Amino acid sequence: MESSVKASVDSETESSPGVNETAAASGQRLSEKTRQQADQPKTQDDLVEQNSSYVQDSPSKKRKLDVEIILDEKHSEDDGGASKRSKLERGGGSEDEPSPGGLTERKRKLQPQDALETQTRKFQKLEEGHSSAVAAHYNELQEVGLVKRSQSRIFYLRNFNNWIKSILIGEILEKVRQRKNRDITVLDLGCGKGGDLLKWRKGRISRLVCADIADISMKQCQQRYEDMKCRRDNEYIFSAEFITADCSKELLVEKFHDPEMYFDICSCQFACHYSFESLEQADMMLRNACGRLNPGGYFIGTTPNSFELIRRLEASETESFGNEIYTVKFQKKGNYPLFGCKYDFNLEGVVDVPEFLVYFPLLTEMAKKYNMKLIYKKTFLEFYEEKIKNNENKMLLKRMQALESYPANENSKLASEKAGDYAHAAEYMKNSQVRLPLGTLSKSEWEATSIYLVFAFEKQQ
């Protein structure tokens, strides 16, 4: 079965409010206090929030994308789903490198069979090479203890991101419970070392399936789960299974202990962008994420915001941007294909594996194939501003130490020594009658965390 989807999208590059170091001028808001380390005084019930766009007063750039996606749908083995092949045309030219199987008959006659096989092997080797790099990168990441983690330059940044995930997961679990209050099943796609296991336990789910490409990470995830069971003697904990697989290339249903299993939630945190190397990989990721969701189930996650990444890139004088915490480097400006738009991401001096741009309107359109409807998409800043109004969320922010106390007390020091990194907080203190210390993130951390967004899709009845 063949279908053709044509879209002409006029999209104005999105941007969050610009960084402005004058609190009064930028309209910075107060919302919450935080507790830092145990030896620090209680902070005021307000957070000085620095607006988090990377470049001030940078003009929006209007882009017109004329996209034609041709999908060849074939019957699959598991549940009548479809795999697809794409041809992406822009200005009459294809952005995707054609595979041997997509060549016309005329080209086949001009190219010897052994050359075709060589080309196929090269393409497969490139794909396998990137998947192996992703697995190797996460396998090599060392487990870090709580003490060392608290000394990290990005301690508060990580905690803030973790708070975002906690609120997202808790909110969606509540939505599921409005429909059913027991036997909640979850698929954690790209689970890593199991950083969200505690969230699922607190959410009182019944069953969890964890899947990730990195085998060592999966072993560590499973060990965390076993340790959690041992610590909770008589307390109920969900059952779990652990699958090592490339979720952008392998069909997970074939690896489930129960091939008839369906889920209420699929969570994919900071991972789905790896699948946008090609349409086929992005579709397999969505098939794994959404193909086995119950009606009314949710696909949720966090991912880099392509509009913000491109906005910062275009505002930069080079092919890269960032600060001392993070850097993003593209191969070139002005050419952003829908698939395979690679960039290198570096966090706190650690070189990460290549990532791929996710054009979110395309993700939304592709998800419709699996009967998914976008419920919301928000930048981290938008999500924070909305959720911090809830008192329980405020308390969780403090417990998770997701904000830094400013100014630091005499027994501690600020996370950043960079000049101007707390100018927004200092300026606010001058112009407001507040109790100290305040809760905030450094300017550098705001810039790093504001490249992300949260999303939630719902499976239609």
From Swiss-Prot:
CDD domains: AdoMet_MTases (cd02440). One of its GO terms (biological process) is 7-methylguanosine mRNA capping. PROSITE patterns: RNA_CAP0_MT. Residues 152-460 form the mRNA cap 0 methyltransferase domain. Interacts with importin alpha, leading to stimulate both RNA-binding and methyltransferase activity. Interaction with importin alpha and beta is required for its nuclear localization, importin beta dissociating in response to RanGTP, allowing RNMT-importin alpha to bind RNA substrates. Interacts with elongating form of polymerase II and RNGTT. Interacts with RAMAC, this interaction significantly enhances RNA-binding and cap methyltransferase activity. Its EC number is 2.1.1.56. Residues 1-117 are annotated as: Disordered. Catalytic subunit of the mRNA-capping methyltransferase RNMT:RAMAC complex that methylates the N7 position of the added guanosine to the 5'-cap structure of mRNAs. Binds RNA containing 5'-terminal GpppC. S-adenosyl-L-methionine binds at residues 165, 190, 212, 246, 269, 274. Methyltransferase activity is activated by RAMAC. It catalyses: a 5'-end (5'-triphosphoguanosine)-ribonucleoside in mRNA + S-adenosyl-L-methionine = a 5'-end (N(7)-methyl 5'-triphosphoguanosine)-ribonucleoside in mRNA + S-adenosyl-L-homocysteine. A motif (Nuclear localization signal) lies at residues 107-109. PANTHER family: MRNA CAP GUANINE-N7 METHYLTRANSFERASE, MRNA GUANINE-7- METHYLTRANSFERASE. The record marks 193, 199, 224, 273, 355, 452 as: mRNA cap binding. MRNA binds at residues 161-162. Residues 65-93 have a biased composition (Basic and acidic residues). Keywords: Methyltransferase, mRNA capping, mRNA processing, Nucleus, Phosphoprotein, RNA-binding, S-adenosyl-L-methionine, Transferase. One of its GO terms (molecular function) is mRNA 5'-cap (guanine-N7-)-methyltransferase activity. It comes from Rattus norvegicus. This is mRNA cap guanine-N(7) methyltransferase. GO terms for cellular component: mRNA cap methyltransferase RNMT:RAMAC complex; mRNA capping enzyme complex; nucleus; receptor complex. Gene3D superfamilies: Vaccinia Virus protein VP39 (3.40.50.150). It comes from the Eukaryota. Belongs to the class I-like SAM-binding methyltransferase superfamily. mRNA cap 0 methyltransferase family. Residues 14-29, 49-58 have a biased composition (Polar residues). The modification Phosphoserine is found at residues 11, 15-16, 58, 94, 99. It is found in: Nucleus.
